[in-house]
A protein has these predicted regions:
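Loop-helix junctions at membrane interfaces
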Residues: 1-238
Length: 238
């Protein structure tokens, strides 16, 4: 009897691992569907502002990072970047060449820099918020407190949003300053000032919205009993 029980244990462990893996894939697919629906619904995921687009697509990526961890968050961040790539290729604005190599304005065209701008910041949106929240929880536990950290949720949301905005805009300056200046009818010498104005006009409100939404949604979904009921495993250690 003892041998039989011992033989069953690895099989049970394997079945449990497979079940967790399937649940993880389903959860990732659900968040992926949310991102795709938002991305391709007019004025929802991407909001046209003439020369550029504002976005709140980073919010589900941030929430996914907190609930499922940085690996799945990074995958969903890549999906965020892919929707941006498709949107800017199929429905371009004057500056879409910074997000896709398949669009040009006059003599200005995209290239490898476009792919870096389109994907790298968005992947990081799915990774960094997890560690920001984990750090907030570490300091919270040091003070003898438990439960969801409101400050951590806000910081995670703001960080994810600012990582996207600051990296995208600064990489535009690195790779496409002349083309970006020409597309916006701005002198090359003044293009970074123009970029800073976009960060202020678009980036700051986006960060505030991301912080508020991450707090409101996270306060519900990050509670231990809710996470366990929904099957989320994020390795935050609480």
């Amino acid at each position: 009897m003892e041998k039989l029980e011992t033989g069953r244990q690895p099989q049970n462990t394997q079945q449990a691992g497979s079940r967790i893996s399937i649940i993880g894939m389903v959860q990732t697919a659900i968040f992926g569907a949310i991102i795709i629906i938002m991305a391709f619904t007019p004025f929802l995921g991407y909001i046209p502002l003439g020369f550029t687009r504002a976005t709140i697509l980073h919010v589900p990526v941030i929430i996914a990072s907190l609930l499922m961890g940085p690996k799945k968050g990074g995958v969903l961040g890549f999906l965020f970047g892919l929707t941006s790539f498709i949107n800017n290729t199929m429905n371009p604005t004057a500056t879409s060449f910074v997000f896709t190599p398949f669009y040009s304005v006059g003599e200005v065209s995209g290239g490898i820099g476009s792919l870096i701008i389109c994907f790298v910041p968005r992947i990081l949106v799915g990774i960094l918020p997890f560690y920001v929240y984990k750090l907030a929880m570490y300091f919270r536990s040091k003070r003898g407190k438990s439960g969801v950290s409101n400050a951590g949720l806000i910081l995670a949301g703001v960080t994810g949003s600012l990582v996207n905005t600051l990296l995208v805009m600064n990489l535009i300056f690195v790779f496409f300053r002349e083309g970006y200046a020409a597309a916006n009818d701005v002198a090359v010498s003044a293009v970074y000032t123009f970029i800073l104005s976009i960060i202020g006009i678009n980036g700051v409100p986006e960060a505030i919205v991301a912080g508020v939404l991450t707090l409101c949604i996270g306060r519900v979904l990050m509670k231990k009993n809710i996470r366990e009921r929904l099957g989320f495993r994020n390795d935050l250690g609480y």
